[in-house]
């Protein structure tokens, strides 16, 4: 069991770049490449952003740049950069 119903609306990379630190976010797009150290370059139609996905948060998902994925996480902002700290990765069919 668990919750079924409306959750967070999907945001774009452009919107995520303007959000506040620690704001929950859902993004749908592709991972273009690994940047090392559990960081990845993620893109959608509006741009690219760095996503940090801990190994255990992949939940067995294997993705290539051709796969569309949904990432649930929080905005992680510091003085110079915005990235997404992922909690969950879902492979879209």
Regions found by a protein language model. Name each.
Residues 1-93:
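OB-fold and OB-like single-stranded nucleic-acid-recognition modules
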């Amino acid at each position: 069991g668990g919750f079924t119903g409306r959750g967070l609306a999907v945001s774009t990379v452009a919107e995520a770049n303007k959000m506040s630190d620690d704001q929950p976010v859902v993004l749908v797009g592709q991972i273009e490449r690994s940047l090392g150290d559990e960081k990845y370059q993620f893109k959608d139609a509006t741009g690219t952003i760095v996503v940090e996905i801990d190994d255990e948060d992949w939940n067995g998902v294997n993705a290539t740049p051709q796969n569309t994925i949904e990432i649930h996480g929080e905005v992680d902002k510091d003085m110079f950069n915005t990235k997404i700290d992922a909690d969950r990765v879902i492979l879209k069919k």
